[in-house]
Design a protein with these regions (language model features):
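N-terminal transmembrane-helix/juxtamembrane module of multi-pass inner/ER membrane proteins
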Residues: 3-95, 134-148
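Membrane-embedded catalytic cores of phosphoryl/pyrophosphoryl-handling enzymes
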Residues: 14-22, 145-255
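Membrane-water interface of alpha-helical transmembrane segments
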Residues: 29-37, 85, 112, 178-188
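Hydrophobic alpha-helical transmembrane segments
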Residues: 35-36, 94-97, 115-120, 185-192, ...
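Alpha-helical transmembrane segments of multipass membrane proteins
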Residues: 41, 45, 49, 125-129, ...
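C-terminal ends of transmembrane alpha-helices
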Residues: 49-50, 130-140, 197-208
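Membrane-interface loops
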Residues: 56-57, 63, 98-100, 105-181, ...
Length: 255
């Protein structure tokens, strides 16, 4: 039994590795990559807009919002409040400005494109969040359910969008520029962990509903895909054009 399982595991790894290499080769072509990028942006945008429509129409997600807010309020502990209050601090705009400024200063002379990507993603996502809050005007959870009192609108969550557009994107860029497999695993884990912790902290402290957090994640993800995908597409198209020009410039030796 064990030899069979081992053989199956090895064969599956080889198949996955082969498919991944073929996919990378296929995506070197700018046309398939453009289709993939456009599909991802449209899909995430549709998810966020659909979520916003459900919130406006009081669909089932609103019932889930209320149930989860009451359940978390009934199960809070002083230790939990202290932990998640510290975690949610990372998503405050003051902290985000400091982190973004430090990242830009560090990256500007090393990886300027990465610095610009973080600026555009963070700024763009916060503009969308501000417009969403002003447009939807959704009230925060009732004061009896909250630990932190906030007076601005609830949907979408600014902390959640920052957790993706700033922190997750930053860790992804570190993952992309690191050669060490161990560090790659660390950056990838943090890219998922930070949004999850910051998003859950907003729920635990009662300052946001679940749909607010999901909407904020979606906004941050859309901008992150945009700032990573568009430069990659430009690079692929430039490489393809250079390769085509090189082929055209070669003398025709066919007889």
């Amino acid at each position: 039994m064990l030899p069979r399982l081992f053989c199956y595991h090895v064969c599956m790894r080889k198949q996955v590795s082969f498919l991944a290499s073929r996919a990378r080769l296929w995506l070197q072509n700018p046309a398939p990559f453009a289709v993939l990028l456009g599909t991802a942006l449209l899909y995430v945008g549709a998810l966020v807009s659909g979520l916003a429509e459900d919130v406006l129409d009081n669909e089932s997600i609103v019932l889930t919002d209320g149930w989860l807010a009451h359940w978390l309020a009934a199960h809070r502990t002083p230790v939990g409040i202290g932990i998640f209050d510290a975690i949610t601090f990372l998503g405050n705009w003051e902290v985000a400005v400091v982190v973004l400024t430090a990242a830009v200063v560090f990256l500007w002379n090393r990886r300027r494109r990465s610095a610009l990507a973080m600026i555009v993603a963070t700024t763009g996502s916060q503009i969308v969040v501000s417009l969403g809050k002003a447009g939807f005007g959704r009230p925060r959870p009732p004061a009896v359910l909250t630990v932190i009192t906030r007076l601005d609108a609830s949907f979408p969550s600014g902390h959640s969008s920052i957790s993706v557009a700033l922190y997750a994107l930053g860790f992804y860029l570190l993952f992309h520029s690191t050669r060490s497999p161990r560090l790659k695993r660390l950056w990838l884990a943090l890219a998922f962990l930070f949004p999850l912790l910051i998003g859950f902290s907003r729920l635990y402290l009662g300052v946001h509903y679940l749909s607010d957090v999901l909407g904020g994640w979606g906004v941050g993800l859309w901008w992150s895909i945009l700032v990573v995908g568009v430069p990659d597409f430009v690079r692929r198209r430039s490489a393809a054009n250079t390769q085509a020009a090189d082929l055209r410039s070669r003398p025709n030796t066919a007889k």
